[in-house]
From Swiss-Prot:
The keyword rRNA-binding does not apply. This is UvrABC system protein C. Residues 16-94 form the GIY-YIG domain. InterPro entries: GIY-YIG_endonuc, GIY-YIG_endonuc_sf, GIY-YIG_UvrC_Cho, RuvA_2-like, UVR_dom, UVR_dom_sf, UvrABC_protein_C, UvrC.
Length: 610
């Protein structure tokens, strides 16, 4: 207990109802969020003569203020607790650092339903399938579905404005519901039903229906239809034979945990309709002295409750540990999902094998992460020594990319004590400068980045500038002109110049805008760290520049082609199904567009390719 916090007086005001409490330090920062069935009883436990753990003892010493929020039920308290944890990211809570929503496959409720990748809240009417471990898995599945079932994947804006079928129809990837007469309502709906069954894991039902239709077509002597359905059957069989299918068709999330050297790894295995869709490893931030059961308990709550609007809840969750609040979590998730959600910790049979697999993956991922951290920590320590710093907790690096001065993009990448912090990587579109003036570009991005109030934790110890003394001089000038509330003297500015032939290992470092720089040995761990952050910055800048250049080029290229006016541009985009299919089209395919001659098709093709 601190001198400035009177726990006895505070506890006199606390109710015995359920609710959530927030603990603050002297600076007014939330350091811990908790919930309780009985607030008075729970908060009193913090101020006994003997507390439960060293972690709690350290927490109590830092308390300067406590706020409480009373709720109607314990379930409400649980939901509010995890929302507050997400909002405040308190130092003494276990924190799930990756809160990105999972991608899903969306089947719309339109007259002619479309398939699409989806992230975020489920506002649009339709059906959602997933979750998938990453967007690549969704795109791969959508591409596969296009080959198996010709259901449209175009945007409604394109679909509504078509009068002729697009390229996807011509290559057999879409049945063309946009143009009357190409496919019957019954046949299109049948393909949509196949998609629905396939995504629900009911492959055998799809095959049974297709086989029945093929036999019927043969009986009626419709051999072309029978051959087409036969090809579809073979394609579906090839896909289903490649997938591991359990005898159990339920939806499961399997959560395995590993812990070592103060670092925890939680590995989630996603199983839908008996198929392993994929998995993902998480490394939650764990305060010292935290029990592993608390890590699992908090992870499950944050993982499902914080992302409640965007995650697809399975019917059952298998865990590595027995949770103290298992029933409360299960009832809260069931209430959220509108159906029963079970939480199991002692599975048998296939479920036990799944849990063992998740546990093995967690251990493997943890070993890899510890190895990477050990290397990063060694390099950080070596770099701090070379730069005469006590320690380095945060570094940022800047690079500029452009082509002949056009579409200039600056990048900023961030490393902390554990390596890259990719969620904080940023790109800046540079404008209002003389084309090709890298000094002005660097000056602009530094002013935009640092010419404002910064949280103490966001002030870097080292700022690397990709370039020689000229770029570093610009950085010094910018920092000299800053009028900010934080200590602008804290960051050490370092220029990184490549050798004459730009080979790795020949970099020269500059700590001042004048005088000679110095180089590090090629095998120096500190140099390897500098190369890592510099290369990340360069890649981030050039990727952003290419995206910006491509966007400008693609939108303006059609306008620059002689003989292609607004009307022809509209016809081209409508016929091809958008700009991307047009970019991928051959001369022959472009020539099929109404009012486009062979000569003009060649001109369009060459203009878009070069």
């Amino acid at each position: 207990m601190t001198d400035c916090f009177d726990s006895k007086e505070f506890l006199k005001t606390v109710t015995s109802q359920p609710g959530v409490y927030r603990m603050y330090d002297k600076a007014g920062t939330v350091i811990y969020v908790g919930k309780a069935k009985d607030l008075k009883k729970r908060l009193t436990s913090y101020f006994r003569a003997h507390v439960a753990s060293r972690k709690t003892e350290t927490l109590v010493k830092n308390i300067a203020q406590i706020d409480v929020t009373v709720t109607h039920t314990e379930t409400e308290a649980l939901l509010l607790e995890h929302n507050y944890i997400k909002l405040y990211q308190p130092r003494y809570n276990v924190l799930l650092r990756d809160d990105k929503s999972y991608p899903l496959i969306f089947l719309s409720a339109d007259k002619h339903p479309r398939l699409a990748i989806h992230r975020g809240a489920k506002h649009e009417k339709g059906e959602y399938f997933g979750p998938f471990p990453n967007s690549y898995a969704v795109r791969e599945t959508l591409a596969l579905l296009q080959k198996l079932f010709p259901v449209r994947q175009c945007e409604n804006s394109v679909y509504r404005n078509r009068s002729r079928p697009c390229l996807q129809y011509q290559i057999g990837r879409c049945s063309g519901p946009c143009v009357p007469g190409l496919v019957s309502e019954e046949e299109y709906q049948r393909q949509v039903d196949y998609v629905r069954l396939f995504l629900s894991g009911k492959d055998q039902q799809v095959l049974t229906q297709l086989i029945s239709r093929m036999e019927e077509a043969s009986r009626l002597l419709h051999f072309e239809d029978a051959a087409r359905i036969r090809d579809q059957i073979q394609a579906v069989r090839r896909v289903t034979e490649q997938q591991f299918v359990s005898g159990d068709s339920e939806d499961l999330d399997v959560i395995g945990v590993a812990f070592d050297a103060g670092l925890a790894c939680v590995h989630v295995l996603f199983i839908r309709q008996g198929k392993v869709l994929g998995s993902r490893s998480y490394f939650p931030k764990v305060p010292a002295g935290t029990e592993l059961s608390e890590v699992v308990q908090t992870f499950v709550g944050q993982f499902y409750l914080q992302g409640s609007q965007v995650r697809t809840l399975p019917g059952e969750i298998l865990l590595d540990f027995t949770l103290a609040e298992k029933d409360l979590l299960a009832s809260s998730l069931s209430e959220l999902a509108g159906r029963k959600i079970q939480i199991q910790s002692r599975p048998r049979g296939d479920r036990a094998r799944y849990l063992k697999l998740a546990r093995t993956n967690a251990s493997t991922a943890l070993v890899t992460r510890l190895s990477q951290q050990s290397t990063i920590h060694q390099r950080m320590k070596e770099l701090a020594k070379i730069l005469n710093l006590d320690e380095i907790n945060r570094m940022e690096c800047f690079d500029i990319s452009h082509t002949m001065g056009e579409q200039t993009v600056a990048s900023c990448v961030v490393f902390d004590a554990n390596g890259p912090v990719r969620s904080e990587y940023r790109r800046y579109n540079i404008s209002g400068i003389t084309p090709g003036d890298d000094y002005a570009a660097m000056s602009q991005v530094l002013k935009r980045r640092y010419g404002k109030a910064l949280d103490d934790k966001k002030i870097p110890d080292v700022i690397f500038i990709d370039g020689g003394k000229g770029q570093l001089s610009q950085a010094f000038d910018v920092f000299a002109s800053l009028n900010v509330p934080w200590d602008k003297q804290k960051p050490l500015l370092v220029g990184v110049a490549k050798g004459s032939d730009r080979k790795a290992g020949l970099e020269t470092l500059f700590l001042a805008a004048e005088g000679e720089g110095f180089s590090l040995p090629p095998d120096s761990p500190a140099l390897h760290l500098i190369q890592h952050i510099r290369d990340d910055s360069h890649h981030h800048a050039i990727t952003g520049h290419r995206q910006r250049r491509s966007k400008v080029k693609n939108t303006s290229a059609l306008e620059l082609i002689e003989g292609v006016g607004p009307k022809r541009r509209q016809i081209l985009l409508k016929y091809m199904g958008g700009l991307q299919p047009l970019l991928n089209a051959s001369v022959e395919e472009i020539a099929k567009v109404p009012s486009i001659s062979q000569a003009l098709a060649e001109k369009i093709y060459n203009a878009l390719k070069h």
